[in-house]
Every structure is written in C-alpha cells, then in structure tokens.
Design a protein with these regions (language model features):
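Second-shell residues forming the walls of enzyme active-site clefts
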Residues: 96, 104-121, 208-367, 371-372
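Membrane-proximal basic amphipathic "stem/tether" segments
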Residues: 1-52
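Glycine-rich anion/phosphate-binding loops
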Residues: 104-109, 154-167, 207-210
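Mid-to-C-terminal alpha-helical segments outside catalytic/metal-binding sites
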Residues: 361, 367-397
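N-terminal hydrophobic targeting/anchoring segments and the immediately downstream early-domain regions
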Residues: 31-141, 343-345
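Active-site mouth loops of central-metabolism enzymes
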Residues: 68-79, 150-159, 245-254, 318-325
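Short, acidic/polar
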Residues: 76-88, 164-168, 258-260, 328-332
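Glycine-rich, aromatic-flanked loop segments that form ligand/cofactor-binding clefts
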Residues: 117-144, 161-188, 209-233
C-alpha cells in the first residue's frame, strides 16, 4: 500500500468518526496503529525484499508451511502484497488470506491472485465466503450472493444448500482461491454479537448444524476449495466478540456444542481444516489459556478425544483477543506448542516485513528451550502439505 492510499483511508475513517463517534472511534484507533506500525516496518523492507540472511534449511522450509499471512491494500500497488508474493515465491511463507480491506474491484482481485500464484510455490489462498454479511466476494464482483447460514437452514434442504455451495465453490476456484474459512458450526444465540446477531449459525440442533455444515464442506470441496470448520470448541454462546477482546465461554458453553464438530468429523466429508476460536474456557483449559494456545483444547480435546486428524489452524493472532494478552512471538510459539498446524497472522498492526525470518528464529529458540520439538514442526508441516496435495494446481482465470 502506498503512503497516499494510507492517508486517504485515514481521512475517510476520520470523517466517519464525526458522523458516528461512538461507533467508529475504535476503528480510527486501529487505523492509526496500522499506519504507525506500517511506517516502522518499512525500515526493514529492503532487507526483507532482498532476502538478506534468510534461513534456507529444512526447519525453515517446514516453518514456512505453517504461516498464512495477510497484507495491506486491495491492489498490486501494495508494497506489502508485493513483498508477500516474493516471500511466497521464495518458499518463506506458505499461504495468504484476504479480508475485507483486501477486496477491491474484481479486476484488482484477479491481479492480486495472479501476483501470489506467479511463482513456483503455489500458496494456500484463503477467504471468508460463508454467505450473508461474511462474504468478501459478492454480487458486485459477479459472484452468487449466498444467504446467511440461518436463512439457508430455514429455506433450503441440505441437498439444495449443497448445490448452492457447489456453485459458489466453482466461482472461488475459477478465480484462484483454494481455501474457504467456513462453515460455521457454532450454535445460534440471537444475543451473541459475533455469530447470532450476524445470522452465521445454522441453528441449535447438532444434527441440523451438521447436515448443513456437511453440505457446505461437500459443495466447496467438490469444486476444489477446501474448508475450515469453525470456531472450535464453540463460539455461539459467548457474550462478546473475539475480534475486540477475549470471549469467555466458561459459564455459557455446553458439551452439546462439540457435537456438530464430532458428527462432521465422523461423516464422509470431514473438513480439511478446523479453526480454533479465540475463546477462553477455564474448565476445558485449566491453565486459563485461550483455546488458541491451549494444548488441553487443541491436542487433548480436538485431536485425542474427538480424533480429528486434519490440519488445525488458528484464527488471526493479531486480533485483539490475542494481542491484548500476549506478544506475537508468544502467540505463535504457544499456538504451535498447543498443536496448531497453521498460524494466521494479519501482519497489520506492527507490520513486520521480516516476519518469516523472525518466526524461524523464534521456533529455533523454542526448540532449544524444550517448548517445541523438531518432530512437532515436521508433523505439522506434513499435515499442511497433505492439504496442498488435495488442492492441486487450481483453475485461476488468465
């Protein structure tokens, strides 16, 4: 992103503050943080661009598989997008994810996807494409507008939903995306700010949630787009939104919220990935850690008790729920130690052009200190490579 683009966005957000001070103050504060962090990060940009002193051993290659990273801007003029593409091409980073601010015109999206896919290493390219208000590519981009999950469950059978999701998957795959960050398997609670109020849940009956979750997974997978079921172990009954702080489910969560995950894992269409929510549950995690960095939840509950064998991914660790509690370094290392395979890092607040080099160094330190093992990193990388093999070369438009 150019400095002029940052200034333009900052002015737009400043104008919105005067229209709605209470609703946009937080957004403005985030923009200021992003601008300052970007400016500081640019000091390391030349070293990152030329790959000075970048590690090239087997451990570094494994760590690269585990990183799925965001970028600034919505077109190929973005300096961070260009650097991220270069790091993907050199094998320093394994994936990229798009959020709202990365989606401009369909022409710009196509150019960005070509930029990321241009090298020898084909990245994981992820986007939220649930439907309703969580659909980054919509009718304005020539995409089928998907209803929110709650409406799908109310008006369609699972078979009808699967046909709709298949069409949506074909549209994503044709553009070049290969990962959809969905389906949502959380329970519906109308008071929940993150799930219920946005109508992102299929209901409260585990069997019904599973049926539509399977339709979602099966439809997108049939088009070559793999899915990440979320938000384990269940975000639906929280009273806060993890985008803006810790979502404590210690007193509101019930074991029934595990059932949609367990049922989908036992189906013929197990999702390739599961996303861990930035959720706190003091009984499930006696060390009072967020689920994202909790070995009892990621390894003990998800892996061992429910038997999930696919790849486990974090939500964006730069979200407030995590960043307010720990440094990026601590979050990455603890997430990997807990059993996650993919770590999502927006790299927006505190932009770090040398992120891949830093993560490799942090992992080496953690291995030397006994926090991680070389075998853990290799096993996680192997699960991510298995996902790549299922995706194939893709069908992006020229």
């Amino acid at each position: 992103m150019r400095i002029s683009d940052i200034a333009k966005r900052a002015r737009a957000n400043l104008a919105s503050v005067f229209k709605n001070p209470a609703g946009t103050y937080r957004q403005l504060k985030r923009v200021v943080r992003a601008v300052l962090g970007y400016a500081r990060g640019m000091l390391d940009y030349p070293a990152a661009w030329f790959g000075l002193s970048r590690p090239r051993d087997e451990l570094a290659a494994s760590v690269a598989e585990l990183l799925i990273v965001g970028f600034y801007g919505s077109n190929t003029r973005s300096l961070s997008a260009r650097l991220l593409a270069r790091q993907i091409h050199r094998g320093e980073i394994g994936g990229v994810f798009f959020v709202n601010q990365n989606i401009g015109s369909i022409k710009d999206v196509k150019k960005l996807l070509r930029l990321f896919r241009a090298g020898p290493n084909q990245p994981l390219i992820a986007v939220d494409h649930e439907g309703g208000i969580v659909q980054r590519l919509n009718k304005s981009h020539g995409f089928t507008q998907l209803p929110a999950a709650k409406r799908v469950a109310a008006r369609m059978s699972p078979d009808e939903a699967q046909k709709l999701y298949t069409i949506a998957g074909q549209e994503l795959a044709a553009l070049g995306f290969n990962i959809n960050l969905g389906p949502v398997l959380d329970f519906d609670n109308p008071e929940n700010p993150a799930i219920g109020k946005a109508r992102r849940s299929y209901g409260v009956d585990p069997e019904r949630i599973t049926a539509y979750g399977e339709a979602f997974t099966r439809g997108f997978a049939s088009a070559g787009v793999l899915c990440a079921a979320k938000h384990f172990p269940g975000h639906g009954n929280s009273v806060t939104d993890s985008h803006h702080g810790v979502a404590d489910i210690s007193t509101s969560w019930t074991t029934a919220e595990l059932e949609p995950f367990a049922r989908l894992f036992a189906s013929p269409h197990t999702p390739a990935m599961v996303m861990i929510g930035h959720l706190r549950h003091d009984s499930l995690s006696p060390d009072e850690q967020l689920a994202t960095v909790s070995a009892p939840i990621v390894t003990g509950l998800l892996r061992e008790k429910l038997g999930y064998q696919g790849a486990v991914m974090t939500g964006d660790i730069d979200m407030d729920a995590v960043s307010q509690l720990m440094s990026r370094k601590h979050a990455i290392i603890q997430a990997l130690a807990a059993g996650n395979d993919l770590v999502m890092i927006k790299n927006l607040f505190g932009y770090d052009p040398l992120l891949p080099q830093h993560v490799v160094r942090w992992v080496r330190e953690a291995i030397s200190q006994g926090v991680l093992t070389d075998a853990q990193i290799k096993a996680a990388a192997a699960r991510v490579r298995a996902i790549r093999q299922r995706i194939g070369p893709g069908q992006a438009d020229p």
